[in-house]
């Protein structure tokens, strides 16, 4: 598995969406979960697969009408690494929010 060299907010959103699922998911569900455009999500999924973080397979449900869906799921190593990245992001966001709250004025007016 290759490391992700540029961890962007959209990449973290895709990782988080995949982590939130108990089973393989198709791209449209990732798009809906992240609120990101298909032109953002699918290249991220392709890159994650190329780097060994996730694997994909085609849904072979012959009873379901419509086009086949490509399903995405983590590799064993990818799931652990993704959890670490997403947890680190949450910790950083929480720390930034605490710092912002600590720096806010108390709401009291100071007069001279």
Model segments located where?
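Short, hydrophobic-biased segments on the C-terminal half of alpha helices
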Residues: 45-49
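Amphipathic alpha-helical dimerization/coiled-coil segments
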Residues: 80-112
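N-terminal compositionally biased, intrinsically disordered segments and leader/signal-like regions
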Residues: 35, 76, 110-112
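Basic, amphipathic "hinge/linker" alpha-helix immediately C-terminal to the N-terminal HTH DNA-binding motif
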Residues: 63-86
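N-terminal helix-turn-helix DNA-binding core of bacterial DNA-binding proteins
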Residues: 2-42
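Short beta-strand "wing" residues that participate in macromolecule-binding interfaces
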Residues: 56
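Glycine-centered, phosphate/nucleic-acid-interacting loop/turn motifs that mediate DNA/RNA or nucleotide
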Residues: 52
